[in-house]
Amino acid sequence: MERIDKIIASQGQYSRKEVKALIAKGRVTLDGRPLTSSSEKADPAAAQICIDGKPLEFKRNLYLMLHKPKGYVSATEDREHPTVLELVPPEFRGRELFPAGRLDRDTTGLMIITDDGVLAHNILAPKKHIPKLYHVQLDIPVTDAMRAGFLEGVRLNDGVCKAAELLRTGTCTAQVTLREGRYHQIKRMFGCYGAEVVELKRLGMGRLYLPEDLEEGACRELTPAELALLQKR
């Protein structure tokens, strides 16, 4: 059981102060009866809470998919650059959201933004080995030596990388699948072969892939089917 004002405020549309004002004005009902106190408790999964006659759709956690554009940092706040949270639709910003993982400021593609710490751990923890798929464009042609080296494990100054799959898709383009996430890892791996990464885009995480119709900068909720794909091992 939780306090009504906490339940409503947790959904991100109203602050607890605003919820108390709504209740005082008789605009909130619980199971069909007007509420008179914000301290009353209810089971958020079972109770029917309405605001101005409209049922509150309670969501314990929120899961958003963002097509990250260049220029945004993967953080909740930053003094120098805009953050990915600034791309979240206003109706979700009242929740304690954070990016599940990071992409460099000049990297684009799929990001998950959530308030579910358990899910974030499950898709980011090294022991989980969740594959992440990237599109890469280089300044020089992709070579067989790169492919073989990635599969064997590239040695960086912070250790040997786990085996990575490299699929050449064009003269200077490839898809890379990683199962770990080191700092600037793909850029450093190609740097070992004298190549510079000029474009980097994340296409997928686990079994979830970036939809072709989600434009850069767009952010929306995951569908139940997409969430299930993200959680599959």
Where are these regions (language model features)?
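Basic, flexible Lys/Arg- and Gly-enriched helix-loop patches that mediate nucleic-acid binding at interfaces
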Residues: 1-233
